[in-house]
Design a protein with these regions (language model features):
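Conserved alpha/beta-hydrolase "acid-adjacent" motif
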Residues: 385-391
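Gly/Ala-rich beta-loop-alpha elbow adjacent to hydrolase catalytic centers
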Residues: 183-187, 191
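N-terminal cap/lid segment of alpha/beta-hydrolase-fold proteins
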Residues: 31, 36-94
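Alpha/beta-hydrolase-fold enzymes
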Residues: 197-320
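Short beta-strand/loop motif that positions the catalytic acidic residue
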Residues: 378-380
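Short, surface-exposed "cap/lid" segments of acyl-processing enzymes
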Residues: 91-136
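Alpha/beta-hydrolase active-site loop
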Residues: 148-171
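Catalytic histidine-centered segment of alpha/beta-hydrolase-like enzymes
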Residues: 409-420
Length: 434
C-alpha cells in the first residue's frame, strides 16, 4: 500500500512539474495569434516552413568568393581544397548598411538558411556577407587559429579575424554606412560573442546584432542532440541499419545540394526515408552526428591529435578515408568535448577544470554584457528542441523587451515564415519592433 502511495505521489509530482514547466514556457511567449502552421516541434525542425507560408523573396546576385586567412599556413594534403576560406557576398551599388551572416552548426555560407537571410536583407537594402559556421570543415582548415573549435571566445576571435580580412578586400569597392551581424543556432551564439569582442576591438562598432534560436549552453544543447540518437527504432543495436538507410537517402540528397548536411538535409532525408513522426528525433540526432563527425575528423587531422587517426600518420588526397569516417560517425559531440576538446586546451590551461571549460561555453558567461547592451536582440521559439527545460526563460529574463519569443517553430523551423522574416529585417531597420 505504501509503495502504491509513493508511486502515486511521484506521478502527481511529475504532472505538477510538467504543468509548471509548460506554464513557465507559456509565460515567456511574446507573440500572440501566431499562425505558423506546424505545432509539433520535431516536425517543425525537420520540415521547416511550408512553401505557401514562406516570405516572398527575390533572386539576388549571391556570389561565392575565397580568401586566404593564414597565407603562411600549410594545409594537410588530404584537405588540399581547404586552404582558402569560402564565403558569399551580395553587394549593393550605392552606400548601404552591411550585415554579416554566420551560419549554424555544420552549415556553409551558401546553405539554405543563410541564402534566405541574404535575400531578405539584400531586398531591404543591405550589403550582405555570408560566412560558414566555425564548425564547417572549410572554416576549420582555413580560418580556425587553433584548428579545434568550440571555445566561445576563440571562435569569436576567428570569426572577427575573418570579418576584418573580408572587409579589407571589400573596402575599396563598396560604401558602407553601418555594420551589423546576425546568425542562427550556433551562429547566433557566435554573434553574441563577436559583438562583445567588438566592444574592445572597435573595428566595426556594430549598430545592431540579432541572435536567432541560439543555445544558452553549447554543452547542454549538444548533449540533448547527442541523446536524440537513442530514438533510433530498435535502439542503438539498430544504429547501423538506420544509419545506412540514412546514408542512402543522403547520397541522393547530396547529388541535389552542395550543402546536404547543412540546412536542407533534414527535410530532404525525411522525405526520402518516409519516416514516422516518432522517428524524427532519431533523424535529427543522426544528422547532427554526421555534422559533428566531419568537424571532429577535420580537427583531428589538422592538429594531429590522434583521436580518430593514429597520431603521426599523414593522410594525403588519395588516402582511403572510409574507416576513419566509420569511427567518426560513432563519436558524439559530447565525446569530442571530453576526450578531444578538453585535453587539447588543458595543455595550455592546466588549472582550468572540466566544469569550468563547460561553463565558459555559455551565454551565461557574458550575461552581464547581454543585459546591459541595447544593440542586441533575440528571436527564439518556446518549443526549441536544443534548449533544456527552463533555458528559454533565460532569454526573457536577460533580454526583456529585446526578446521576441514565438510559441512554436522548433529549432529554426520558422525562420522562413513570412512573419519571422519581416521581424528579422525589422530588427535592423526599425529597432526590431514586431
Amino acid at each position: 500500500m505504501i509503495s502504491k502511495i509513493k508511486i502515486a505521489v511521484r506521478c502527481i509530482a511529475g504532472i505538477f512539474a510538467y504543468l509548471a514547466s509548460s506554464m513557465a514556457t507559456a509565460s515567456v511567449v511574446t507573440v500572440e495569434n501566431y499562425e505558423y502552421p506546424i505545432t509539433d516541434r520535431f516536425v517543425a525542425t525537420v520540415v521547416g516552413t511550408p512553401t505557401e507560408y514562406e516570405a516572398k523573396l527575390p533572386s539576388i546576385p549571391f556570389e561565392q568568393r575565397s580568401i586566404d586567412i593564414f597565407p603562411d599556413r600549410k594545409t594537410p594534403d588530404v584537405f588540399f581544397y581547404g586552404k582558402e576560406l569560402l564565403y558569399s557576398v551580395a553587394l549593393q551599388d550605392n552606400e548601404s548598411p552591411l550585415i554579416f551572416l554566420i551560419a549554424g552548426t555544420g552549415a556553409s555560407h551558401e546553405g539554405g538558411k543563410n541564402r534566405n537571410m541574404a535575400k531578405a536583407f539584400y531586398q531591404a537594402g543591405f550589403h550582405v556577407v555570408s560566412i560558414s559556421s566555425p564548425t564547417f570543415n572549410n572554416f576549420v582548415t582555413a580560418a580556425s587559429y587553433t584548428g579545434v573549435v568550440g571555445d566561445a571566445k576563440k571562435d569569436a576571435e576567428d570569426i572577427y579575424r575573418v570579418f576584418e580580412k573580408i572587409w579589407a578586400e571589400l573596402a575599396d569597392d563598396i560604401e558602407v554606412s553601418t555594420f551589423n551581424v546576425t546568425g542562427y543556432s550556433l551562429g547566433g551564439f557566435n554573434a553574441a560573442y563577436v559583438a562583445k569582442l567588438d566592444e574592445t576591438r572597435q573595428i566595426f562598432n556594430f549598430e545592431n546584432v540579432l541572435l536567432i534560436n541560439p543555445p544558452v549552453s553549447i554543452y547542454n544543447s549538444i548533449s540533448l542532440l547527442d541523446r536524440m540518437i537513442n530514438n533510433i527504432p530498435g535502439g542503438m543495436d539498430n544504429f547501423d541499419k538506420f544509419f545506412n538507410n540514412l546514408m542512402r537517402a543522403y547520397t541522393n540528397v547530396y547529388k541535389e545540394s552542395a550543402d546536404a548536411i547543412g540546412d536542407d538535409f533534414l527535410y530532404k532525408a525525411y522525405k526520402a526515408l518516409n519516416l514516422k513522426d516518432e522517428q524524427l528525433a532519431a533523424l535529427i540526432g543522426v544528422s547532427f552526428r554526421l555534422s559533428s563527425a566531419s568537424l571532429i575528423f577535420t580537427s583531428d587531422v589538422v592538429v594531429d591529435f590522434g583521436f580518430i587517426k593514429p597520431k603521426g600518420l599523414i593522410l594525403n588526397r588519395y588516402s582511403n578515408l572510409t574507416e576513419y569516417n566509420e569511427v567518426a560517425n560513432r563519436i558524439g559531440f559530447t565525446d569530442y568535448y571530453h576526450e578531444f576538446f578538453y585535453p587539447f586546451y588543458k595543455e595550455t590551461d592546466p588549472d582550468v577544470t572540466r566544469d569550468e571549460f563547460i561553463s565558459a561555453i555559455s551565454l551565461k558567461e557574458i550575461e552581464e554584457y547581454l543585459r546591459s547592451t541595447d544593440k542586441i536582440t533575440v528571436m527564439h521559439n518556446a518549443d526549441d528542441i536544443i534548449l533544456q527545460p527552463g533555458e528559454i526563460e533565460f532569454f526573457a529574463d536577460v533580454f526583456g523587451k529585446r526578446a521576441t519569443i514565438y510559441p512554436t517553430g522548433g529549432h529554426c523551423g520558422n525562420m522562413s515564415y513570412r512573419d519571422n522574416v519581416a521581424h528579422m529585417v525589422a530588427a535592423f531597420t526599425d529597432g526590431g519592433t514586431p
